[in-house]
């Protein structure tokens, strides 16, 4: 059995490339390095809640669900959501911690996915299916990229 510590990570980077950058495997620091100038990052008011089964077994797929609420966006209404295993900004993908992403909410198998919200929509729920390839505890974190009325567009 693998015990998980699911933590809430509400403060994240709020700057990115206008129109998004597409789904991919990304470290969190990508927010400053590949989406824009790190000096324009700011704290998000979004609330992120990450959940999973209480007990997870080695080699058996499990689902992690992320609910993001209180979302503020720019005119493009694009948000980017991360599933991470570390808060250092590098080597923080689930694969870095020995987990395989079998699928994501957009039909791929990456830790960073983008969603375009409809007008008036200020929340979304997404999920990833993962499988642990090694025994031991793992902490998971969620992070978000988005723009807002007073910030750089994304």
What label would you give each PLM region?
Residues 9-154:
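Sequence context surrounding c-type heme c attachment/ligation sites in exported
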Residues 2-10:
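Bacterial N-terminal signal peptides
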């Amino acid at each position: 059995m693998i015990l998980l510590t699911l933590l809430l990570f509400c403060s994240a980077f709020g700057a990115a490339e206008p129109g998004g950058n597409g789904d991919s495997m990304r470290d969190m620091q990508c927010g400053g390095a590949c989406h824009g100038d790190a000096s324009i990052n700011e704290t998000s008011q979004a609330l992120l809640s990450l959940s999973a089964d209480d007990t997870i077994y080695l080699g058996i797929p499990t689902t992690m669900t992320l609910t993001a609420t209180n979302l503020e966006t720019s005119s493009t209404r694009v948000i980017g959501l991360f599933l991470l295993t570390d808060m250092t900004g590098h080597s923080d993908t689930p694969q870095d911690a020995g987990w395989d992403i079998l699928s994501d909410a957009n039909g791929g198998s990456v830790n960073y996915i983008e969603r375009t919200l409809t007008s008036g929509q200020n929340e979304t729920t997404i999920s990833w299916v993962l499988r642990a390839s090694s025994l031991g505890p793992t902490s998971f974190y969620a992070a978000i990229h988005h723009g807002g009325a007073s910030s750089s567009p994304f």
